A protein has these predicted regions:
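Alpha-helical scaffold domains
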Residues: 107, 165-400
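Flexible coil/turn and secondary-structure edge motifs
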Residues: 1-167, 215
Length: 400
């Protein structure tokens, strides 16, 4: 069990909000980083003690990471506001994140920098080692549990998001499988230097994740955004599956959201299970496909893959030109996940127009990676595959 300390304005609301998340074991309100030992609420209220209303959070980092806790905390505050949150004013209501383990500094500062970059200006949130913490009076502990109608500076939408976020995590954990939790990190290449480095898995199958997403298909964009920031792979997938449902009812906002939150679409299954059904579906209905070529030029491989895989919906409508152009752009790509994506889309074209695919292969097979070629001709007869592979092999030998 680990500890972190959050100051987010009135500690009644902050404790209730943070305490709702799965993995948070215990919370305690108190007064932190002031000059007076063991102060009372009345003394802190004068703003002369230097103390800040604070919540001590004890959590299981096997369920929720410090980085995720910090991101969720930032969702509950206005990080630009000085000595004020909601209607509460005074230095006791300043915001901050304080740690007792120096190893936690890196995670706090990483999230802090992310938020500061998003706002584009300095944050008014303290971040440093805890100097002191004194528990508040019993009256202030679990105040909103004991007084459900009591004062809370946080909005109802923020509290609802926290409650539903916790429900999603609980449902995913309940659906997890111990064996899959061991196998999936290897399958998705999460080792150092691999494409999925650092990704974490609960061990939930896609069908079970779909079931959880379906139960939360009316979720807010705020919840989807929070889930996309999770370290858990299945949480991000669940968010994307919810977003697909959103797209069916409100396509324009859903596509805009998707394109501005691609950082969380960072493994091949997350791309393949979302891009065709959000961006791809959007492209079928809209003539401007420039976004595909913007994504294709991205230095982020996942965004490159999104550009290619999104065209699956166009292919299903027998519109092949964008796929062909992108296949030419990525003819000499070195990453096997891009080679496979291009080959996959070419194969889909071949299912509908084999002559067009054969013409493309005859023109470009000399530059085409063998992986791309193998994927593209998977539906060909054994003789056709053998002939193309042999011709490719001869070309490769000649080049050497």
């Amino acid at each position: 069990m680990k500890q972190i300390y959050f100051a987010g304005g009135c500690f009644w609301g902050t404790e209730h909000y943070i305490g709702s998340f799965e993995g948070v074991i215990e919370t305690e309100t108190g007064y932190a980083n002031g000059d007076l030992a063991d102060p009372t609420y009345e003394q802190v209220y004068t703003d002369r003690t230097g103390h800040v209303e604070c919540v001590k959070v004890s959590y299981d980092d096997g369920i929720i990471s410090l980085a995720t806790l910090c991101r969720l905390f930032f969702r509950s505050i206005n990080p630009l506001s000085i000595n004020r949150q909601g209607n509460d004013c005074g230095t006791r209501y300043r915001t901050g994140i304080y740690w007792t383990d120096e190893a936690d500094r890196a995670d706090v500062e990483k999230v802090y920098d992310e938020v500061q970059q998003a706002y584009g200006e300095p944050l008014a949130v303290e971040k440093w080692p805890l100097k002191s913490f004194y528990p508040a009076e019993e009256y202030h502990q679990d105040y909103l549990v004991k007084n459900p109608e009591g004062y809370c500076h946080l909005s109802l939408s923020t509290l609802r998001m926290a409650k539903e976020y916790a429900e999603v995590i609980r449902n995913l954990i309940a659906a997890s499988d111990k064996e899959k939790k061991i196998v999936l990190p290897r399958f998705f290449k999460t080792g150092k230097g691999e494409y999925g480095e650092g990704d974490k898995f609960l061990g939930v199958t896609v069908p079970k994740t779909r079931k959880v997403a379906k139960a939360h298909k009316e979720a807010s964009y705020e919840l989807i955004e929070a889930l996309l920031e999770s370290e858990w792979h299945e949480c991000r997938l669940c968010a994307l599956l919810i977003l697909i449902e959103k797209y069916k009812k409100e396509p324009e906002p859903a596509v805009r959201f998707y394109l501005t939150h691609l950082k969380g679409v960072n493994n091949w299954d997350l791309v393949d299970l979302s891009a065709p059904y959000i961006l791809g579906a959007h492209l079928v209905r809209n003539p401007d496909h420039g976004v595909l070529y913007t994504l294709a030029q991205s230095p982020v491989m996942w965004e490159q893959r999104i550009s290619v895989v999104s065209t699956l919906m166009l292919i299903r409508h027998c519109r092949f030109s964008d796929t062909m152009k992108l296949a030419e752009i990525f003819l000499e790509t070195k990453h096997d996940l891009m080679q496979k994506a291009v080959g996959w889309m070419l194969r889909e074209i071949g299912k509908r127009d084999k002559e067009l695919l054969v013409s493309f292969l005859n023109t470009h097979k000399d530059q085409m990676p063998r992986t791309t070629l193998r994927y593209a001709i998977e539906k060909f007869t054994a003789e056709e595959r053998q002939e193309l592979i042999q011709r490719k092999h001869k070309t490769d030998k000649t080049r050497k």
